[in-house]
């Protein structure tokens, strides 16, 4: 057993006595922030398991439920509580019934939602038949297709434009910028041109694509790569399929967080940095006020710093390689 495993063992002992009930009381909406401007777009009330919950328009169901003190979205086959996992719509851990349809609440806005409930054997079956729709499928043609509108994808788009090549960028999110949208700190001068040094991450995200966003398809996901240099894309907002034909394909889909396994790593209140940053900096929701950070690298320190900006208290930063 290595030192990291020993440290995780200590962490498991700490989490063994963790109470989700305690964390429920200290989840809150962020109303003041020293860096970010918090928009006020009105409120919307929906029913969650029969109880009224009010959330901010333009923000997700997950944010509304956590702010209302409901971090549990599902249960395992053994009855264990389940909560957010990736927080960016990739894993399906937060799937719930939203007005009768299965949706991932970490990316589904509260706007116009009437009822949300946990998916159970009693309230959901897969016997329903989907009627095929005979609709013409649009085909877009370009030089290069780019999957991902984060820093890498947008940098590729910019370079291709300088070379005189056309491109189409496809991203499943509702905004461009990827992880830069979650970063409130000022970046160092890390590139030769010194274009972005000193700028905060979310400001870099606004400038990466310039003023011309043509050829960028948001709310869309690539679900198949076909023959004849064609990819199949689903417009998740309008529920339509379309094709993109390109001479080359660039995959710039970013990364997903790694969660080392330890006892009770699935307890609501134990989250990856990606979930914490997304809920905090994009959804203005603190998942807790008293924080223990596991990992003292770049991400651990930055997330802890951002949590302190948002009003949380970081009690300790846990290093797996510490003596």
Predicted regions and their residues:
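Short hydrophobic targeting helices and cationic amphipathic motifs
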Residues: 5, 11-14, 18-19, 65
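Cysteine-centered iron-sulfur cluster-binding motifs in ferredoxin-type domains/subunits
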Residues: 54-59, 83-92, 146-149, 153-158, ...
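Rossmann-like dinucleotide/flavin-binding elements
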Residues: 132-172, 255-322
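Conserved N-terminal glycine-rich FAD pyrophosphate-binding loop of Rossmann-like flavoproteins
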Residues: 174-196
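Short beta-strand to alpha-helix junction loop
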Residues: 188-205, 322-323
């Amino acid at each position: 057993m290595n030192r990291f495993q020993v440290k995780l063992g200590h962490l498991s002992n700490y989490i063994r006595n963790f109470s989700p009930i305690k964390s429920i009381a200290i989840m809150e909406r962020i109303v003041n922030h020293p860096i970010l401007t918090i928009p006020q777009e009105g409120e919307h009330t929906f029913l969650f398991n029969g109880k009224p919950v009010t959330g901010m328009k333009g923000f997700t169901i997950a944010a509304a439920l956590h702010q209302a003190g409901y971090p549990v979205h599902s249960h395992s086959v053994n009855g264990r509580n389940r909560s957010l996992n990736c927080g960016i719509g990739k894993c399906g851990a937060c799937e719930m019934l939203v007005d009768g349809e299965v949706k991932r609440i970490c990316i589904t806005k509260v706007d116009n939602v009437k009822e949300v409930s946990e998916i159970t054997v009693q309230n959901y079956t897969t016997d329903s038949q989907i009627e095929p729709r005979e609709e013409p499928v649009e085909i877009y043609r370009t030089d290069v297709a780019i999957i991902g509108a984060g820093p890498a994808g947008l940098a590729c788009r910019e370079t291709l434009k300088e070379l005189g090549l056309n491109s189409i960028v496809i991203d499943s999110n509702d905004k461009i910028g990827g992880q830069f949208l979650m970063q409130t700190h000022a970046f160092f001068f890390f590139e030769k041109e010194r274009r972005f040094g000193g700028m905060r991450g979310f400001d870099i995200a606004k400038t990466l694509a310039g003023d011309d966003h043509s050829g960028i398809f948001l709310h869309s996901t690539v679900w198949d790569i076909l023959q004849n240099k064609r990819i199949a894309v689903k417009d998740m907002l309008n529920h339509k399929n379309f094709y993109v034909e390109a001479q080359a394909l660039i995959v710039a889909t970013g990364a997903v967080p790694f969660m080392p396994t330890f006892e009770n790593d699935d307890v609501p209140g134990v989250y990856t940095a990606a979930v914490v940053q997304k809920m905090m900096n994009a959804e203005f929701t603190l998942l807790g006020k008293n924080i223990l950070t596991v990992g003292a690298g770049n991400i651990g320190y930055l997330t802890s710093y951002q949590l302190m900006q948002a009003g949380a208290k970081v009690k300790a930063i846990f290093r797996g390689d510490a003596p």
